[in-house]
Design a protein with these regions (language model features):
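Extracellular loop-to-transmembrane helix junctions
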Residues: 29-58, 337-354, 363, 367-373
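Membrane-interface interhelical connector segments
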Residues: 241-271
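Membrane helical hairpin/interfacial module
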Residues: 23-118
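Membrane-interface loop-to-helix entry segments
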Residues: 104, 132-162, 344-351
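Membrane-interface "cap" regions at the ends of multi-pass membrane proteins
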Residues: 1-37, 209, 358-374
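Hydrophobic alpha-helical segments and their helix-loop junctions in multi-pass secondary transporters
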Residues: 94-97, 133, 152-177, 193, ...
Length: 374
């Protein structure tokens, strides 16, 4: 594999991962089957996700620090099977980019653009994503840092507003574990585990570009922890403003919550703040999966310049997002009830674990042969 020229700084990767983890999870309810304990689902999923990433994808990264996921897959299991597995991940990354694009379009239509064709919204988003990707991974990561700072300011503003508003009641978050751990585990597996923390497997395509490789695992763990805290804050806001019953039934609870908040009849109708947050985080969620699919195709098909793949893969993502489901209800049902079992669990956990074990075995055999020959 050729030495990578473009590099990512640690702070830029941290910002990128945080925005990626927030993605559509910041507005789509996560773990609400556990009702008041949804925040425990988020924290538990984050803890498991950090441990898993440190052991399995992190272990693979330590074995092959200069190779992307699709590249070292061929090194581990051979060129033929490795290529097939890599191609499966290429399709997976494109599919999840399409799902997130559909999430983005559905929310914008439900919130403010009901008269705008879905196709137009998708084109605007994917053209913007494709343009930043075409500028290179370094520009993409630096752009993430700029918008990360803006999103931090938005979150601080939202928190202050909730604390000062008379519509929020944090007693609604109680009781903690009122029904025990069973609802938490039920909500955690598999949806709370695979979304969003299991999706970190996609970052295995980008870690080789980090210019301080020894910081990779600390950066990913810190970014995952911060995103979990922000998602917990969003859950607290939803439950304290709407109550647990409405928050658990709402399709986009954060949007509903902030549309109700007001401060002294001066600051009100803050649903536009949620739209801004959604556009930014969705941009980097869609862009990350699309970028990963482009790098995977670049590696598998030996394309000289990956930037030539931006348009064709962008068109595939757009068309798939438009045809993926008949309506938003069907789309959410598939994303929460079907995709986690049949796609996320095998591709986020099962296959990486197998690759890691085979990689360790191959290294042990190689070390034993080297010791025997010396």
């Amino acid at each position: 594999m050729k030495k990578t020229i473009e590099t990512i700084g640690p702070i830029h990767l941290f910002a990128w991962i945080t925005l990626f983890q927030l993605g559509t999870a910041v507005v789509v309810p996560v773990g609400m089957d556990a009702k008041q304990d949804a925040w425990i689902v988020t924290l538990t999923g984050c803890l498991i996700g950090i441990l898993f990433f440190a052991i399995v994808p992190g272990g693979l990264y330590r074995l092959y620090p200069s190779m992307t996921f699709t590249a070292y897959t061929r090194r581990i299991v051979g060129p033929f099977l490795g290529w097939l597995i890599g191609f499966g991940y290429l399709l997976y990354f494109m599919y999840i980019a399409s799902r997130n694009t559909r999430d983005f379009m559905d929310l914008l239509i439900a919130a403010a653009y009901d008269a705008t064709p879905m196709f137009v919204l998708g084109v605007f988003m994917l053209v913007a994503v494709g343009y930043i990707i075409s500028l290179g991974i370094e520009v993409y990561a630096r752009t993430a840092f700029i918008f990360f700072l803006m999103c931090c300011g938005v979150f601080i503003f939202i928190i202050l507003l909730v604390l000062l508003s008379d519509l929020s009641d944090f007693r609604r978050i109680q009781p903690v574990l009122g029904e025990g751990w069973h609802p938490v585990w039920k909500a955690l597996f598999p949806t709370g585990l695979t979304f969003p923390f299991g999706e970190m497997i996609v970052m295995a395509m980008f870690l080789p570009y980090l210019n301080q490789k020894y910081k990779a695992l600390r950066i990913t763990a810190g970014a995952m922890a911060l995103s979990a805290i922000l998602l917990c804050i969003a859950t607290f806001i939803n439950i304290s403003v709407l109550g647990v019953e409405i928050a658990s039934r709402a399709t986009f609870p954060l949007f509903t919550s902030l549309s109700r908040l007001r401060l002294a009849e001066i600051v009100q109708r803050l649903d536009s703040v949620v739209l801004f947050l959604l556009i930014i985080t969705s941009f980097f969620k869609i862009g990350t999966f699309m970028f990963a699919s482009i790098l995977a195709a670049h590696d598998l098909f030996k394309v000289r310049n990956y930037k030539t793949l931006v348009m064709p893969i962008g068109v595939i993502v757009l068309l798939t997002s438009l045809t993926i489901a008949g309506n938003s209800t069907e789309h959410l049902r598939e994303g929460l009830k079907i995709v986690p079992y049949y796609m996320h669990l095998p591709l986020q956990f099962a296959i990486p674990i197998c690759l890691w074990l085979v990689g360790l075995l191959r290294r042990a055999i190689r070390n034993r042969r080297a010791a025997a020959s010396s």
